[in-house]
């Protein structure tokens, strides 16, 4: 009986996620669904659907939680639900004050992904693994660092290198990061992680996660956030300012293989930025070797250093 109820409730969504050419769907706000197409020139396409109201989406999450015996209390308890739906579709959802689409979501929003189980008749050839053939280098990030600082930054943006925007207070780090986002493909799916909403994302396919440092009312913490973000299939991940609360999780997130990972930190030079990031990680993960951690950061992360002298703000390093 429970499957009958769930399948009936899923009907408005099934027309979007059931076709074989659809890899997954994402809902970032009521009334709109994004479909990720297999092999599409533009991977994400959006459709409006008034049936997908906020109340419908909340009811759906509650129903999934009840049927699969998952805890779900978006205000005071657990705002995230994971499940495997009929047809082996993977379901990930969040509702409440920790998720927003825009500033109008003052009481909280809702976001969910439903992902297919994959092509059943695949083979190793689909992954370009064949006897006697060399493995492909997919988006190799060999150190392409032009001499010109402008070209060096644009190269980092274009190849998806992680970028840390560093600077002292009032050097314009967030403003600079907001401008960088205008240079990213407008068809990209962007997820931000902040303790207060500051980042302005021009891409329409976006989700904002908010974890206040002072108003934590549920168990949706940075560790649980990591699990959710990777299930939400971002093309771009924007971390808020690095703190002792989020540093280790953002470092783990950077290691998940996603391109275009951007965040900011308070520091007065690129070397100080690497050191400050490492020190914040060590506050919660003391087992790391500091020297080795900084060396690994220098391999993976580009730093853009901003400095200020009175009203003058300038980029002083691009490494």
Task: Kindly label every feature range from the protein language model.
Residues 296-319:
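Conserved P-loop NTPase
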Residues 44-158:
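P-loop NTP-binding catalytic core
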Residues 156, 166-169:
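P-loop (Walker A) phosphate-binding loop of NTP-binding proteins
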Residues 161-166, 179-298, 306:
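Switch/coupling sub-region of P-loop NTPases
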Residues 6-19, 84-86, 286-294:
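Short aromatic-glycine motifs in intrinsically disordered, low-complexity regions
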Residues 173:
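Conserved lysine of the Walker
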Residues 26-27, 33-38, 42-47, 313:
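Amphipathic coiled-coil signal-relay and dimerization helices
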Residues 1-24, 68, 74-78:
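Phosphate-interacting basic helix/loop segments used at nucleotide- and nucleic-acid interfaces
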